[in-house]
């Protein structure tokens, strides 16, 4: 990679701004976040005009409704972005937090302390609200960010970033930057090891896989959400249906929506029809195996690869399983490691499921929609990690830090 590339220049400027950010007090960072929120409110007309151009272009290009919904900004959504920045300002600052501390036999005090990561690159698809969320979390945790949005949201991202940057002092303005250009620019960002400390991709499987396989910079993988709900033999059917409806239909285009329901054969006769009733009333098409179709002919046949789909739409896969072990095996084969749910009255089933399923979040008798930084009390999240290092699950402020060891003595030398 050429040392004179635009991405390298941006990363160097971001590093300089991050150095200033590291020294800011919490009150200073909180004031900046509030100012960025004001910038969004002041710039609402410009942001809406830019977003309208992006949406029109996307619609003309045949963008599907799920992506158009993610792309679209409204006055209410922009206000939500501003409120989100203010919410981050009210969160505890993890920087400087002592994780643990002890004294050596010679009296040296050792503390493990949270510090910013540095320069974080975020590559994401058609969601302009991610722009403000990412900038807010990075700034509060003392990091600079290089934001690589999709071309479909270019005008929106330009307007959002311009509105926020207009309220930042010059010495840290480059802590929030938009990375523009073609695919070669994305490749430069992914290979800018030594200039960019961390990459976080947010989007569909294609984007995430491309970043994970092509990056030389360390990556936190925010996986796709092929999430399951298991209705165990002891489940309260009404509870299970209510949870399934919420998890599927509240926002079908997000990663914590369920895509598949697995029903224990012992309860299928009483659970399948109420489930299909509730889903049909809300416009959901249920795709199932032969056994489920025999129980309710409204179910359409599932294609061979149906259970690997992250629909992000009003579609739901359904399968009858012999027992909980088969459900867990199905999840291991088809799941994405995001969020997995069981509805059951059995404590042993709860414990077996929680200890057997390999996922960032396991839910018992509650909706997968709770797997969210806001619901966890983290404030705005940078994404939901489905890997095991360096973070797993919703990533808030603490997940945007690393640690350093600070040793204090009074002249000790090692014997």
Curated annotation (Swiss-Prot):
The keyword Oxidoreductase applies. It catalyses: L-glutamate 5-semialdehyde + phosphate + NADP(+) = L-glutamyl 5-phosphate + NADPH + H(+). It is an enzyme of class 1 (oxidoreductase). Keywords: Amino-acid biosynthesis, Cytoplasm, NADP, Oxidoreductase, Proline biosynthesis. One of its GO terms (biological process) is L-proline biosynthetic process. It is found in: Cytoplasm. GO terms for cellular component: cytoplasm. InterPro entries: Ald_DH/histidinol_DH, Ald_DH_C, Ald_DH_N, Aldehyde_DH_dom, G-glutamylP_reductase_CS, Glu-5-SA_DH, GPR_dom. The keyword Oxidoreductase applies. Its main location: cytoplasm. PROSITE patterns: PROA. Its EC number is 1.2.1.41. It comes from the Bacteria. Pathway: Amino-acid biosynthesis; L-proline biosynthesis; L-glutamate 5-semialdehyde from L-glutamate: step 2/2. GO terms for molecular function: glutamate-5-semialdehyde dehydrogenase activity; NADP binding. Belongs to the gamma-glutamyl phosphate reductase family. NCBIfam families: PRK00197.1, proA. Catalyzes the NADPH-dependent reduction of L-glutamate 5-phosphate into L-glutamate 5-semialdehyde and phosphate. The product spontaneously undergoes cyclization to form 1-pyrroline-5-carboxylate. This is Gamma-glutamyl phosphate reductase. It comes from Cutibacterium acnes (strain DSM 16379 / KPA171202). The gene is proA.
